[in-house]
Regions:
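N-terminal acidic, glycine/proline-rich low-complexity segments
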Residues: 1-123
Length: 123
């Protein structure tokens, strides 16, 4: 939340990934959080829906995967955001933004690194 309000940071976008919750839940939550914070200028890009190294059944059985499922996302506090995620995939967004600003982008990954790993694999 502090980063969203910081004048020192130039946030370029938000990517989501499956982690403690499904990527769908992470995406609707990110959209709602940005709306509450008054940051509708930031686009949200849906990311990886599975970890790279585990099967779905293994992942769902872990402590952090206990809430992860194919169920539709639950309604965030205050309802769903008025907008939706961008059609561009998170991995492609990361590749595009880093290539557009070489040496200037710092990725602040606060969840699983799956999107970053997939972007590195592709480039």
């Amino acid at each position: 939340m502090l980063a969203l309000q910081s004048p020192e940071l130039d946030l370029l976008g938000v990517t989501t990934v499956a982690g403690n919750f499904s990527v769908e839940q992470a995406t609707v939550d990110a959209l709602r959080l940005l709306e509450i914070a008054g940051r509708d200028d930031l686009k949200v890009y849906r990311g990886a829906n599975m970890p790279l190294l585990h099967e779905k059944s293994e992942y769902a059985a872990t402590r952090h995967g206990q809430w992860w499922s194919d169920a539709p996302p639950t309604t965030p506090p205050g309802g769903f955001a008025r907008r939706t995620a961008e059609p561009l995939a998170a991995v492609q967004f990361l590749i595009d933004v880093v290539n557009a600003h070489p040496g200037e982008v710092t990725i602040m990954a606060i969840g699983p690194m799956t999107n970053v790993a997939m972007a590195l694999r592709q480039e």
